[in-house]
A protein has these predicted regions:
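Short loop/helix-cap segments at secondary-structure boundaries that form the rim of catalytic
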Residues: 40-47, 59-60, 102-108
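Rossmann-like NAD(P)-binding element
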Residues: 56-82
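NAD(P)+-binding Rossmann beta1-loop-alpha1 motif at the extreme N-terminus of oxidoreductases
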Residues: 6-51, 56
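An accessory alpha-helical subdomain
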Residues: 161-265
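ADP-ribose/adenylate-binding Rossmann-like module
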Residues: 85-101
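Glycine-rich, N-terminal phosphate-binding loop of Rossmann-like dinucleotide-binding domains
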Residues: 68-70, 95, 138
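Rossmann-fold dinucleotide-binding core
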Residues: 97, 101, 105-158
Length: 265
């Protein structure tokens, strides 16, 4: 299932940033079609069939579906798609939060595979992904997992395989905490005419994060595991405020020692 293997009929749902990425990635090795209700988003996709209606999927008869729409609509789109695909078609998603996905997949009767490319066009160099990561859910269809394992390995991604439950817990650390920290930085921001290096680096990250689609940001923040992490941030800020109020040098030294250990590789 990949370069040097047999050709598959693959349907990409959604022609946004990641949907377009997968079209570019797969369209020269497989027979690919992209479905999006907005024809404007299909304009610049090449070497692929372009669908704007679910009825067009029937004749294509995909063997694999990659759902790249936003999390808010992922399962809704699957529901609408199911009458238009065969029972042997493998369902897959690349969602950043997967709460309830395992239960959904199992009630469809379809084979399934789930993964999460831990990068996006905002920050990643799509020409060199060797420093980027991807998660492959260890549950689901064996052959589907082989397809995505081979695909991500070919891209040079660092791949980790974990369960659905472990995925959302992991995301609450790797995405929710940085995103919330960025929100706090941006919320208290004032324009600086002579910013220092650290400030400029934070500003670059903040602009990148906040350039993401609102739906994606909501997906990350509404992860059921996010709230406890935000409460941890609040508790740390409360402790730091107390140290500052007390001007307690020993407490500050202990605090810095502790947090430096947290970021050691």
């Amino acid at each position: 299932m990949g370069r040097g293997s047999f050709i598959m009929r693959i349907l990409i749902l959604g022609a946004g940033k990641m949907g377009s990425f997968f079209v570019d990635l797969l369209s020269f090795d497989h027979e690919v079609a992209a479905l999006d209700s907005d024809p404007q988003r299909l304009r610049f996709l090449y070497n692929t069939q372009r669908f704007t209606s679910l009825d067009e999927v029937d004749a294509f008869d995909p063997e694999l579906v990659i759902n790249a729409v936003s999390l808010k609509y992922t399962l809704q789109v699957f529901d609408k798609l199911l009458p238009h695909i065969g029972k042997n078609c493998i369902l897959s998603d690349i969602s950043s939060v997967k709460t309830g996905f395992k239960e959904y997949y199992e009630q469809t009767g379809h084979r399934y595979v789930s993964s999460h490319p831990m990068f996006g066009p905002t920050f990643a160099n799509l020409g060199d992904l060797s420093r980027e990561n991807a998660i492959l859910i260890s549950e689901g269809d064996y052959m589907g997992r082989i397809f995505f394992r081979d695909l991500y390995t070919r891209l040079g991604l660092n791949l980790k395989e974990i369960s659905f439950a472990e995925h959302d817990e992991t995301m609450s650390y790797s995405l929710s905490i940085p995103f919330v920290s960025t929100f706090v930085f941006s919320a208290v921001m004032k324009h600086q005419d002579t910013p220092g290096t650290t400030f400029k680096r934070h500003m670059k990250i903040a602009r990148g994060v906040l350039s993401e689609d609102d739906t994606l940001l909501r997906e990350i923040l509404f992860n059921p595991h996010t709230k406890p992490k935000v409460e941890m941030i609040r508790a740390e800020l409360k402790q730091l405020i107390q140290i500052i109020d007390d001007r307690d040098e020993d407490a500050m030294t202990q605090y810095l020692t502790r947090i430096r250990k947290n970021i050691q590789e």
